Amino acid sequence: MLTVVTCLFPATGKAVRLGLPIENGNTKTRMARFHFLPLLFPALLAAPPLYAGADLAREKRMAEQIVDAILDGSPIRLHAAGNDFLGIYTEAEDTKGGVLILHGRGFHPDWASVVQPLRVGLVEQGWNTLSIQMPVLQKGAKYFDYVHVFPDAMPRIEAALDYLHEHSDGPVVIVAHSCGSHMAQHWILEKGEGALRRFDAFVGIGMGATDYRQPMVEPYALDRMSMPVLDIYGGNDYPAVLRMAPERAAMIEHAGDPRSRQVRVPQAAHYFVDHERELVESVAAWLKGLD
């Protein structure tokens, strides 16, 4: 399970919740392990961030490379926190609702693995989809680097949800993969009910992926989400995703919505390469159960 403590980044002045995976034990044992956090994460707690913020120039380059190649859907420009960012909106003929798709670390809203299959495949099932550009850093940036830009994702998520509500009838669902799920969970932890009121269901794909010796610095928000939640991951996913699956399942059960599920796609890895169809079908089948 995750033990949580809030620590301050001296270089940035930002408080961040640290989630430490621990074994089952009594409360006294769990609390004692808090004392080891400064030893485990000295670089995270004391060092200044390597990146000042989202790499907007890289986002612009990626947008220029993909916009002309978009075959399904329409590129749109959304605005948040003083910056424009790319979205790809695709409309279904008979609309059941809207789906906001958040890609993983360092990618873009038409990424061939996970994102593009979902944003097109769910339209075929009657869902309008909006896939947006999440904040990215330079190539090679790791999970701890991306923690510093989690706040940059919050206004983008909110702007995208506003757009979906304006253009879609029915429920609005967030579908987030990998680092996109970290960013969505950060937003929920920070905004609480103000965030939860904005959407109706949540799909997390490959939740909990980080980097070697870089454990999650924030807990999941799943136990706070009294709405339908789908936790889907690959049987050959990253070790952290697999290891923490029971923790996620317990949190989802605690939240109490009977429509929530945890689904393991047996042969799939983190990016669902060659298993895109199973991913789309699993998500679509679960969404159908929301009717």
Regions found by a protein language model. Give the residues of each.
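N-terminal signal peptide c-region/cleavage motif recognized by signal peptidases
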Residues: 47-49
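N-terminal cap/lid segment of alpha/beta-hydrolase-fold proteins
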Residues: 53-91
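Serine-hydrolase catalytic machinery in alpha/beta-hydrolase-like enzymes
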Residues: 76, 83-86, 95-165
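Primarily recognizes the serine-hydrolase "nucleophile elbow" in alpha/beta-hydrolase
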Residues: 163, 169-225
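The feature captures the conserved acid-bearing segment of alpha/beta-hydrolase catalytic domains
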Residues: 206-261
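C-terminal catalytic histidine-bearing segment of alpha/beta-hydrolase fold enzymes
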Residues: 258-291
